[in-house]
Amino acid sequence: MAHLVEGTSIIDGKWQLPILVTDLNIQRSISVLGNLNVGGLMLELVSECDVERDWSDHALWWPEKRRWLQHTRSTLDQNGITAETQLEFTPMHKEARIQLPDMQMIDARVDFSVNSFKATKKLCRDLGIRYSEELSLKRYIPPEDLRRGTSDADNMNGPLSMRPGEESVGPMTLRKAAPIFASQSNLDMRRRGQSPALSQSGHIFNAHEMGTLPRHGTLPRGVSPSPGAYNDTMRRTPIMPSISFSEGLENEQFDDALIHSPRLAPSRDTPVFRPQNYVEKAAINRGWLDSSRSLMEQGIFEGDIILLRFKFMNFFDLNPKYDPVRINQLYEQAKWSILLDEFDHTEEEATLFAALQLQATLQRDSPEPEENNKDDVDILLDELEQNLDAAALNRRSDLTQVPELADYLKYMKPKKLAAFKGFKRAFFSFRDLYLSYHQSSSDVNSAPLGHFSLKGCEVSQDVSVGQQKYHIKLLLPTAEGMIDFILKCDSEHQYARWMAACRLASRGKSMADSSYQQEVESIKNLLKMQSGNGNENGNSNTASRKAAAVKLPNDFNVDEYISSKYVRRARSKQQIQQRVSDAHGNVRQLTATEAKLQYIRAWQALPEHGIHYFIVRFRNARKAELVAVAVNRLAKLNMDNGESLKTWRFANMKKWHVNWEIRHLKIQFEDEDIEFKPLSADCKVVHEFIGGYIFLSMRSKEHSQNLDEELFHKLTGGWA
């Protein structure tokens, strides 16, 4: 008989199955047959406990296999349960410590039996955050493991007890968090000596990990106390008593502590994780939980720290009326990513971010302006009227003329030898999705010097308003591969029009689209806010637009507003304060919510926004390489400078899946297949980023906004 073991007494073919009732801390042995179903086993167990209580939230958990027995009609034989099996009868909802994007720690009851996608959805609903598919949960990883990266070696020993820092990889597999092997010494050399935090002891934190310190006197399993663990600033744990995490928020009654986050600054006494290179930036994407598996299946247990973060940088319909919590939490995550140098940005941009942050802080207690008395129906009718007017205008434009830009610009091809001669001047024309250029305007009827389709190109900016520098950087797909092309504009107005056209063309839209003029105005507004950043090199036109400087608060701390990289470069803190004060003059009319939204828009305009780095090894390759997943593409990058070497568009992708046996991600494109093994993060993480962005790209205001969870898991599940 399959269930017979030595020493086990058999009565009528029955055998004893031990089950631990966790919340009562008692163990019961139930006499069972292999054909008993899971539901019947729970009924017998409850009867054996002889305790009057509500057991509806309890389920059976199999610790050795790390899975819930959720199919109540399946039998013990079907589940592979024998007399040697140890089961637990435990509540599905348990207490967890959730760190929000603004670094606040809250205690919440979370369902540990459903997949993390559902758990995130419920948590976001309770917090008042719409579009939960943009967020995800992340495990706490000890900082020393975060610095070192993950092992390249497979764990061939089968399932083991999961410890802090370990990540589950597909069904019944595990990978340990260990240093990259010696074969990856080239990566280790890039790390060594480049991060000031690497040689220091204590907890390392960044915008994704910062503030994950436990309450005073408690630490996660396997984590030792350190000098920074009980730092006064970092152990702040604001609990919002007015929020009941078992009930949803109704009637827009959002908690003020979630809309206006408490003040928190990086402490000089606590070492911080500021990524110094692309290997360290790749480490930030470790720890994302598998959306299709439950928390306990991934080694998250009661009382553990879980990080809630915006994962996908594609934000749908940010509305101040419905999203005060969502806007603030997104703003806070953006703020910390800027302060801790997760995104490269210029000094001018840093000053603008500081000015917007200052305005949001100063306006914190000021009431938002009263909205008009229009109800929701009137507002929707107004939006519909505007959309119909724009559509009608577009149709008229299509019948009469196709929008076109034509102007003299300067250009450069950085990878050509001619680049040493600097920029050349030519006459450019932009029509539909195509960019052409001639020697002069009189040559437009002859063959162009160059003709490119901008659909699917990569567009980034290199702008300094103070220095009158307006560069548009294009990475263009051609038959010979990707080529770099830089356009140099002469003025803000010219730059705004051409940059807007390039951005829309990269998304497959022409200037006839109704969003073109909005894009132009958005770029102009951003340039206008940067125009008062106190740069001495600015011309008289820029200087004349500066508003009067504001007097900074007495408790103004530059470390709370400016990245330490630029604080160190400044001659003095007074110089930084003066620049922030000057820049603030251009944003002082904004409300707190408007300042946060402008901060988010400026953050989204950064070249690295929406790019997630991973260290991988391509099939049959010897050395590791840098890969980036973006909103609409996958790219292979130079690991030293981040320069794009090759790009694969999601639009050209036919199929992708994970081979769990060798932990490879295989992607089939129209013209080639690629296969690689992620080294810096779990292979499921990379797969979810690709499938998740494809899922988010399907959202539109014209379609129902009901969350299609089945489609999400189809795109992110990892199975062929």
UniProtKB/Swiss-Prot annotation:
Start and end residues of each PH domain: 402-507
Subunit organization: Interacts with pat-4/ILK. Probably forms a complex with pat-4 and pat-6. Component of an integrin containing attachment complex, composed of at least pat-2, pat-3, pat-4, pat-6, unc-52, unc-97 and unc-112.
Membrane topology: Peripheral membrane protein
GO aspect biological process, one term: muscle organ development
Domain notes: The FERM domain is not correctly detected by PROSITE or Pfam techniques because it contains the insertion of a PH domain.
A Gene Ontology molecular function term of the record: integrin binding
Organism, as annotated: Caenorhabditis elegans
Main location: membrane
Cellular localization per UniProt: Cell membrane; Cytoplasm, Myofibril, Sarcomere, M line
Domain of life of the source: Eukaryota
Cross-referenced InterPro entries: Band_41_domain, FERM_2, FERM_central, FERM_CS, Kindlin/fermitin, Kindlin_2_N, PH-like_dom_sf, PH_domain
Function: Component of an integrin containing attachment complex, which is required for muscle development and maintenance. Probable regulator of cell-extracellular matrix adhesion. Required during initial muscle assembly to form dense bodies and M-lines.
Tissue: Mainly expressed in muscle cells in both embryos and adults.
Keywords: Cell adhesion, Cell membrane, Cytoplasm, Membrane
UniProt name for this protein: Protein unc-112
Region annotation Disordered: where it falls in the sequence: 145-170, 210-236
Knockout consequences: RNAi-mediated knockdown results in impaired mobility, mitochondrial fragmentation and disrupted integrin attachment complexes in muscle. This leads to degradation of muscle proteins in the cytosol, myofibrillar defects and disruption of sarcomere organization.
Similarity section: Belongs to the kindlin family.
PANTHER family according to UniProt: FERMITIN 2-RELATED (PTHR16160:SF13)
GO cellular component, one term: M band
Domain FERM, residue spans: 288-614
